[in-house]
Amino acid sequence: MSRILSAPDLKDAFFAGQFHRIAGTAAQVDGYRPFNEQAMFDLASGSRTALLIAAEDVGLGAMGREEAIGGAVVGAAIVGLGELDLVIQPASRGLGHARAALEEMLVDAPAGLTAWSHGDHPAARALANRYGFDNVRTLLQLCTALPFAGTTAAVDGPEQATSSASQQTSTGPATIEAFRPGIDDAEWVALNALVFADHPEQGSLTAVGLAARAAEPWFNPGDFLIARDRASLRMIGFNWLKIEGGSQSNDDNDSDSDSDDVIGEIYVIGVHPDAAGHGLGRTLMLAGLERLRERGCTSAELYVEAESASAVHLYRSLGFIDRTIDVQYRRHPR
């Protein structure tokens, strides 16, 4: 019922246009993106491949190339590295395109293939059950409104969240300062690997991956909060914030914002195991929320593993509530 179209990369203008059209339409209707950031980075680096799903009955062979792609494409996918991401445009759902495409892609799929269902879509759940995929990971997206009433409250006695991450601030036995590109890179990569040693994606981030993210339009070193031990100056924690389309700094409160809804993301937060259990995570969260408020954000969001009970408890205690759920499936051997 469907057929797979592929191109070497998204430098093919026609192919790229249709891929992004499908992804954008799905995001607009569903309320969440069909491909996560890591998948898009992998695609950009060439380590994974983009595919288009076309309706087989359109007769691609008899049509011109542009006409074929424009009129036949009903879905898109990203494959490679043992992972699969697939989306069908809303107007073409319920017609069997996802099932047909999945069956074709599973023919040569590696053992233990994983697939994400962003938004825990019922149709994806049904396909997972039908083709032998088990739920192996649940990721919660939580959100809260800003300004946040508790962002300047004292934490664990002398520790206090502070405003303006553009300059060094004291938080009891630690200081919080902005990330210094080209200086803090190696130390942060090492700490990130330690903190997320059991995390399949975040813990494997290299200096190259950090540089790729620092090159994104949204990156602002002032939104990358670094906690250091006051005595040793060792990096012991971080809270990296992300404001889409927001790399311009408001540090001096001299920027005007005409946006009615600006979402800031707690992109990744971590605390060195030796510093855990002393309130540093909460302090970094409060400092991050204050920073987002200063930057004009009206709400904050984050992603957290559902099984990370202590982290989920912290975020809920700060007023975060459920927004969406992402589920990762793994195909079990047959």
Place the predicted regions along the sequence by residue.
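Short amphipathic alpha-helix that is part of the acyltransferase structural core
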Residues: 1-39, 156-203
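Conserved donor-binding loop and adjoining core beta-sheet/short helix segment
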Residues: 6-11, 17, 21-109, 114, ...
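Acyl-donor-binding surface of acyltransferase catalytic domains
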Residues: 62, 68, 80-85, 90-174, ...
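A structural microfeature
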Residues: 70, 74-75, 137-140, 237, ...
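Hydrophobic adenine-recognition pocket in adenosine-nucleotide-binding enzymes
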Residues: 88, 269-271, 304
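Conserved acetyl-CoA-binding loop-helix of GNAT-fold acetyltransferases
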Residues: 94-108, 130, 268-273, 277-294, ...
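Active-site/acyl-donor-binding loops of N-acyltransferases
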Residues: 131-151, 286-334
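Phosphate-binding active sites in nucleotide-utilizing proteins
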Residues: 199-209, 215-241
